[in-house]
Amino acid sequence: MQGPAVNIGVLLFIPYRHMEDRILKAVRDSGFDDLTLAQARVFQRIAPGGSRLTDLAEQAQMAKQSVAGLVDELERMHYVRRVPDPDDRRARLIKIAARGQRAAEVAQAAHDQIRSEWRVHLGARRFDQLQATLEELREITDPFTATPPA
């Protein structure tokens, strides 16, 4: 007899957590061993052109003060830098610094390796279907997506 089905949210979370753990391990093993999981979760949300603190807090679903503390730590460790926001003189943008860029490159390589492993495990067709399905589901679940649902 088969037990109850595992909650779909858990099924989505398990591979995410696996990927997150492996990426953070790869980053730490590459010499960025001062980076914590909480810092990495904020760091990964920084937009290519920089992000405002309030946007990072909203996306991380954390208090602005908590994110500010993490960004302060990231800045002290030279992963990020604060620069004036060209659109608003009163605001500052958090941008990825050179050290952060090097860590991000390691993270991207680890991400690519994991995707490759999953593609082999599932097969190309099923992996592509999974990717397409998750992108479609994102349309109705991600409040930060560039294209809001119709």
For each predicted feature, which ranges?
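N-terminal leader segment of winged-helix/HTH proteins
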Residues: 1-34
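Short amphipathic alpha-helical segments with heptad-repeat character
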Residues: 6-9, 13, 17, 61, ...
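Short, solvent-exposed positions on alpha-helices
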Residues: 10, 54, 125-128
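N-terminal helix-turn-helix DNA-binding core of bacterial DNA-binding proteins
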Residues: 21-66
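Charged, amphipathic alpha-helical coiled-coil/dimerization segments
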Residues: 25, 72-135, 139
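A structural signal for well-ordered alpha-helices, especially hydrophobic packing surfaces
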Residues: 50, 138-141
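Short, charged, intrinsically disordered terminal tails
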Residues: 142-150
